Amino acid sequence: MEEDLMEYAPNIPDNVLELIFSFLKLQDLRNCTLVCKSWYRFFCDENNEVWRAQCLQKVPAEAFKNDLLTVVPTYKAKLRAYFHAWNPFDCSRHVYIKPNGFTLHRNPVAQSTDGSRGKIGFKHGRHAWEVRWEGPLGTVAVVGIATKDAAIQCHGYYALLGADDQSWGWNLVDNLLLHNGDAHGIYPLLNNAPKYKVGERIRVILDCDENTLSFEKNYEFLGVAFTDLPEKNFYPTVAAVYGNTEISMVYLGAPLDG
């Protein structure tokens, strides 16, 4: 039976493959890519009907009602971004994840700094994700990375992300880089570097091969922010203090050079 499958699998028309694969669970699709080159080629089309069906089935409809997912143009990329989005079980109790699955909302709680981590951490490879802050920044608005051991909430208005040796962050309010409770200089290294404006796109670039963390703003590379990162599992993380502020995060995959 297995030999018959291997013989006929490469010759099955794409429209028949779409019908067959539409009945499979997402976790089974990867195994299908290993059957033959023809099936692998089929799944390389990230906008085919199978990826479309999986995407529309799993990604909340709310996520498609604005331009949030335009940075990930294919159905497969949108699906992947959803599985990397904010973790509703790994955030401050003063934060909730909106129905679109990609945006967190900080409730207006006084004297609290509140954060959230992404669902999936990274220890190998190169990864990029986009962060967009909606609403006033307040006195603290930090974007960066953290391990699972970093605190995600604290009393007072405090640069929580970067406050210990388990987190690294860039405070968009004063352009300071933060780690282990210390400021590591102004970023980017420009005279009178412009401050972040609400709604601008921040792209975080984590290179686990070179152990660096970098940022882009509005598609302009700002330089390497942190070097010599330890070999740990890092999660996309933010920390905020302003009530009713909202922060969206969309995972992009491997960054494009140039």
UniProtKB/Swiss-Prot annotation:
Pfam families noted in UniProt: F-box-like, SPRY
Protein's UniProt keywords contain Flavoprotein: no
Annotated signal peptide: none
Cellular component terms (Gene Ontology): neuromuscular junction; SCF ubiquitin ligase complex; synapse
F-box domain ranges (all copies): 6-54
UniProt keywords, alphabetically: Neurogenesis, Synapse, Ubl conjugation pathway
BP terms from Gene Ontology: negative regulation of synaptic assembly at neuromuscular junction; neuromuscular synaptic transmission; proteasome-mediated ubiquitin-dependent protein catabolic process; protein ubiquitination; synapse assembly involved in innervation
InterPro entries associated with the record: B30.2/SPRY (IPR001870), B30.2/SPRY_sf (IPR043136), ConA-like_dom_sf (IPR013320), F-box-like_dom_sf (IPR036047), F-box_dom (IPR001810), FBXO45-Fsn/SPSB_families (IPR050672), SPRY_dom (IPR003877), SPRY_FBXO45 (IPR035784)
Main location per the UniProt record: other
Domain B30.2/SPRY residues, every copy: 64-256
Pathway the protein acts in: Protein modification; protein ubiquitination
Localisation: Synapse
Family: Belongs to the FBXO45/Fsn family.
Function text: Required in the presynaptic motoneuron to down-regulate the levels of wnd and restrain synaptic terminal growth at the neuromuscular junction (NMJ).
Subunit structure, as described in the record: Component of an E3 ubiquitin ligase complex composed of hiw and Fsn.
Entry protein name: F-box/SPRY domain-containing protein 1
Upper classification of the organism: Eukaryota, Metazoa, Ecdysozoa, Arthropoda, Hexapoda
